[in-house]
């Protein structure tokens, strides 16, 4: 209700008050003057929705980020700029007043994500860049809408604006990747360290830089698939599956639709299948040596990590076996201590499989609950493989050589708690009979290997 009032001089108010004074029943009543503050409050009008102070402050905070989007649109192309107009509509956006500055920034960066596709497109010429063109055109490539500048700008946009953690991580790694000893991001700036390096580099060094940029673009192509799927609103799994098929071809495609009722998606089945079908050697070598994964390895690693995140622990402790030759991740771990393998850990329910892999090396018995049964996915289904995630902590319960000189080791998942590997019913028939030497005399061996309950046969 809007109340209108007028201000009168004091004498008029006093006269009016006396004129209307009287009694209301037993109560004496008279008119009093309305305080000025009450009159001002009654005359106040609310601003229309969206035009209040908080809304104006929110709009002011958002303005710089809108300017960034417009700048990105001009840099990466008009088509990319047009693609962001619908997402920026006022109807779809939450009220600016309800968001913090950080939330507004993140929202604007996410709205700008489609622009990055234009930048990745402009960078495509780097896939065929020669040493001669690099030396001649670096300034052009690293300025304006040049390929190197567009690539660096697009990767920053993906790193800061993608909702997909894997895409953000991959973009960040690419920006930091060394090209000729200089981070890729710096190659997108003319006049800096990269420009100086190009001027002083030998022809052989320039050729090596060009080769490294070609390798970068292989990874960029896979990242672009993921961003395109995100912009279209497609599931993350589809982008990963498309990337695996593009990289591995029929080798990956053979797993499509093979396990429709299983717990894992097509992309996860592809990754697990490719790993067990020979890719485990290259992937684990890179993981254990701390090397950067190539594009194909990174895709498999993403798919396998997603499968492990989805899988839950087994209801009961599972006993499996592993055979290795040479040194392994647990060789230097003392009994009672915890260690882990930086790579994925393949084990089998069949001790015979472990013996065939071990030879005269090491046979390990493992007790755990977090392993994934990949026997139905692997082309080597008869190996009855149980696969543990990379970095799974294992406690060494026992490590000793038997009478034949084979190292026998017992591990349990650290999350199980101490002595879970000694549970009755799980450990049976050690059967490590003492061997004999050439003279026929019994060989000495660690007495602990005689304890029943550790099936290391």
Curated annotation (Swiss-Prot):
GO biological process, one term: symbiont-mediated disruption of host focal adhesion
Pfam families: ADPrib_exo_Tox (PF03496), YopE (PF03545)
Keyword Transferase attached: yes
Functional summary from the UniProt entry: Bifunctional effector protein that is secreted and delivered by the type III secretion system into eukaryotic target cells. ADP-ribosylates several eukaryotic proteins including CT10 regulator of kinase (Crk) proteins. In turn, induces atypical anoikis apoptosis by transforming Crk adaptor protein into a cytotoxin. Affects host cell morphology by disrupting the actin cytoskeleton. In addition to this activity, acts via its N-terminal region as a GTPase-activating protein (GAP) for host Rho GTPases including RhoA, Rac1, Cdc42 and Ras.
Name of the protein in its database record: Exoenzyme T
Keyword Secreted: yes
Chief location bin: secreted
Organism: Pseudomonas aeruginosa (strain ATCC 15692 / DSM 22644 / CIP 104116 / JCM 14847 / LMG 12228 / 1C / PRS 101 / PAO1)
Conditions for induction: By host YWHAB.
């Amino acid at each position: 209700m809007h109340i209108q009032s007028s201000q009168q001089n004091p004498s008029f108010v006093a006269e009016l008050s006396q004129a209307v004074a009287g009694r209301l029943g037993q109560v004496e009543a008279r008119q009093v003057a309305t305080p000025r503050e009450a009159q001002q409050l009654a005359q106040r009008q609310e601003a229309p929705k969206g035009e209040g102070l908080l809304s104006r402050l929110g709009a002011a905070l958002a303005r710089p980020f809108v300017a960034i989007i417009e700048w990105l649109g001009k840099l990466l192309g008009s088509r990319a700029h047009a693609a962001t107009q619908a997402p920026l509509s006022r109807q779809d956006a939450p009220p600016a007043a309800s968001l913090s500055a950080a939330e507004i920034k993140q929202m604007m960066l996410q709205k700008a994500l489609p622009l990055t596709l234009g930048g990745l497109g402009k960078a495509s010429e780097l896939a065929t860049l020669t040493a001669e063109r690099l030396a001649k055109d670096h300034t052009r490539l690293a300025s304006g809408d040049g390929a190197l500048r567009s690539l660096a700008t697009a990767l920053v946009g993906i790193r800061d604006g993608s909702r997909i953690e894997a895409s953000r991580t991959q973009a960040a790694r690419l920006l930091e990747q060394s090209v000729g000893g200089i981070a890729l991001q710096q190659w997108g700036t003319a006049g800096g360290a990269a420009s100086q390096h190009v001027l002083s580099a030998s022809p052989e060094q320039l050729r090596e830089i060009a080769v490294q940029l070609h390798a970068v673009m292989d990874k960029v192509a896979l990242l672009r698939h993921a961003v395109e799927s995100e912009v279209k609103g497609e599931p993350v799994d589809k982008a990963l599956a498309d990337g695996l098929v593009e990289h591995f071809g029929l080798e990956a495609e053979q797993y499509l639709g093979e396990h429709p009722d299983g717990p894992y998606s097509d992309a996860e089945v592809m990754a697990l299948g490719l790993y067990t079908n020979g890719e485990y050697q290259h992937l684990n070598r890179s993981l254990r040596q701390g090397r950067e994964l190539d594009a194909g390895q990174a895709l498999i690693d993403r798919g396998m990590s997603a499968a492990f995140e989805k899988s839950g622990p087994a209801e009961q402790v599972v006993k499996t076996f592993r055979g290795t030759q040479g040194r392994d991740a647990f060789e230097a771990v003392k009994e009672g201590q915890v260690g882990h393998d930086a790579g994925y850990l393949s084990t089998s329910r069949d001790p015979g499989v472990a013996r065939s892999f071990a030879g005269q090396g090491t046979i390990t018995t493992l007790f755990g609950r977090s392993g994934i049964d990949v026997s139905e996915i692997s082309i080597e289904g008869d190996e009855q493989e149980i696969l543990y995630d990379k970095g799974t902590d294992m406690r060494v319960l026992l490590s000793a050589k038997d009478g034949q000189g084979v190292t026998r080791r017992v591990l349990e998942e650290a999350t199980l708690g101490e002595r879970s590997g000694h549970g009755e019913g799980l450990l049976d028939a050690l059967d490590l009979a003492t061997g004999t030497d050439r003279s026929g005399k019994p060989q000495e061996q660690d007495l602990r290997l005689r304890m029943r309950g550790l099936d290391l046969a």
